[in-house]
């Protein structure tokens, strides 16, 4: 402000104890606004200690700093996309779709076999943009359909080598909770998937686990083949992640309602 010739006349604050310091250090008078918190019973300290409880008081630009991220991983036809959509609905929040599928349709005419090594950095960058968008507008938690480890695993599977740009995003984007789905659900051919044999599915699952470990990424392995059991287990895991903050904000009967099929 000094460089631009701006001289403030007043400082507006709710902290009465700070007024003498502003006067002494800056020579500026302080105008106190609601110092007794009678109109707005909240403080910055309260928000920092318990951001989810006071979520509505946090500016939109600041909320992404507090958002928790949950990545759902798994091989082809493991139910990731459907599960992510259900979780986003039940927690009333955003999700990042799998950009790789969109890329194949928009750039390769829907032919996954046309993928080349040079495509994987573009896929990873698109996925990062999807993640950033989901986090920006999330309601406390954002769900991610497929992470960068999965993109790297497909690159290694199809191209025989890893991509350095994808690895850079693996290192940069560390999610708060990573859930790995066992690839033991019924295979559904959708025109894009090519790893449908039992051998291929198991091989890719092993590759995912190996790459998670090599990148020092902790994950929770959900092994049930039952879709409902998977869903309920993931709800539990997310509730544990958000812990007491979520319990104060969400309905206490969230899980019980899910079990009863009300959500």
What are these regions (language model features)?
Residues 89-132, 234:
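Conserved substrate/cofactor phosphate-moiety recognition/catalytic segment
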Residues 1-73:
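Classical nucleotidyltransferase
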Residues 111-160:
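Conserved nucleotide-sensing/catalytic segment adjacent to the nucleotide-binding pocket
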Residues 83, 87:
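Hydrophobic positions on the alpha1 helix immediately C-terminal to the Walker A/P-loop
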Residues 76:
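The conserved Walker
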Residues 80:
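Conserved lysine of the Walker
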Residues 218-221, 235-263:
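C-terminal accessory "lid"/substrate-recognition subdomains
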């Amino acid at each position: 402000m000094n460089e631009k010739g701006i001289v403030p006349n007043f400082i507006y604050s709710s902290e009465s104890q700070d007024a003498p310091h502003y006067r002494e250090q800056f020579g500026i008078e302080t105008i106190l606004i609601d110092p007794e918190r009678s109109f707005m019973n909240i403080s910055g300290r309260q928000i920092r200690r318990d951001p989810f409880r006071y979520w509505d008081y946090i500016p939109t630009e600041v909320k992404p700093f507090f958002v928790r991220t949950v990545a759902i991983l798994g091989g082809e036809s493991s139910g990731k996309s459907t599960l992510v959509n259900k979780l986003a609905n039940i927690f009333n929040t955003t999700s990042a779709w799998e950009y790789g599928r969109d890329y194949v349709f928009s750039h390769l005419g829907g032919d996954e076999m046309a993928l080349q090594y040079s495509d994987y950095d573009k896929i990873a960058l698109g996925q990062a943009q999807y993640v950033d968008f989901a986090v920006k507008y999330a309601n406390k938690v954002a769900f991610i359909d497929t992470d960068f480890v999965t993109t790297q695993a497909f690159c290694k599977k199809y191209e025989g080598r890893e991509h350095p740009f994808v690895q850079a995003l693996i290192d940069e984007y560390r999610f708060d909770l990573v859930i790995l789905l066992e690839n033991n659900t019924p295979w559904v051919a959708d025109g894009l998937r090519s790893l449908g044999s039992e051998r291929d599915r198991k091989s890719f699952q092993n590759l995912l686990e190996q790459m998670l470990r090599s990148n020092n990424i902790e994950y929770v392995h959900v092994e049930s083949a039952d879709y409902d059991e998977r869903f309920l287990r993931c709800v539990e895991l997310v509730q544990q992640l958000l812990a007491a903050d979520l319990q104060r904000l969400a309905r206490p009967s969230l899980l019980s309602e899910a079990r009863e099929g009300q959500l």
